[in-house]
Amino acid sequence: MSEAYRQPVLGVIGGSGVYDIDGLEGARWQTVESPFGDVSDQILRGTLDGLEMAFLPRHGRGHVLAPSDVNYRANIDALKRAGVTEILSVSAVGSLAEDLPPGTFVIADQFIDRTFAREKSFFRQGSGRPCQHGPSGQRLAGRSRRRGSGRSGHSPSPGRHLSVHGGAAVLDPGRKQSLSAMGLPRHRHDQHARGQAGPRSRDRLLHRGHGHRFRLLAPRSRPRQRRGGGSRAAAKRR
């Protein structure tokens, strides 16, 4: 069947605390194998409001896999083999931004990958797959905006309003979200994020997605003031 006429199948990867999806009709667990190794768990298939879905718990049911033990390539490959056409990855987060309270959703529309010590490509030598480069930034940004950036609605929690924001993500390895000192060097990344995503980099977030830390960064609203008055840029000119 042509890709243009394929029935869309939404794949959802659940993070910590998200091990299934309530309300799925015809729910059934399906085993899918991958040549990239062990998949985190079986895939839960079903339909929700007429949309076919496939759910995969990133850490396995019962949270049996540490972030460093998750085979991310195998998970993505298994969802593709299950017929998934698009993937939504959900993760629990801790915010570093005062204007992002609990209950806020952030959909990253740009990212800067600073991770290491993990396989990142499906096209290593000997894979037998044709490898070609394609632009990802515009594609990611466009899909993210269409999928909900700037939207709002009602949260399942009584009395809580659900807001959705966009932003640029910086991916770093590690799990340090509970360290208060992690908030100290944020200014060092602000200018870098501004060059990547412009004014859309308005949110800061510490995100434990895919075993790595995500920080959504915002450019400063005004130049930092030096002692004695004047900005740093003005001081350099003097």
From Swiss-Prot:
Q: Which GO terms describe its molecular function?
A: S-methyl-5-thioadenosine phosphorylase activity
Which Gene3D superfamilies does the UniProt entry name for this protein?
Nucleoside phosphorylase domain (3.40.50.1580)
What is a single cellular component term in the Gene Ontology annotation? cytosol
* UniProt KW keywords: Glycosyltransferase, Transferase
Could you name the domain of life of the organism this protein comes from? Bacteria
InterPro entries, alphabetically?
MTAP (IPR010044), Nucleoside_phosphorylase_d (IPR000845), Nucleoside_phosphorylase_sf (IPR035994), Purine_phosphorylase-2_CS (IPR018099)
Pfam families per the UniProt record, alphabetical:
PNP_UDP_1 (PF01048)
Biased composition range(s): Low complexity: 152-161
Renumbered to this chain, region (Disordered) spans 123-167, 180-238
According to its UniProt entry, one GO biological process term is: L-methionine salvage from methylthioadenosine
Biased segments, Basic residues type:
207-238
Family per similarity comment = Belongs to the PNP/MTAP phosphorylase family.
Protein name per Swiss-Prot or TrEMBL: Uncharacterized 25.8 kDa protein in petC 3'region
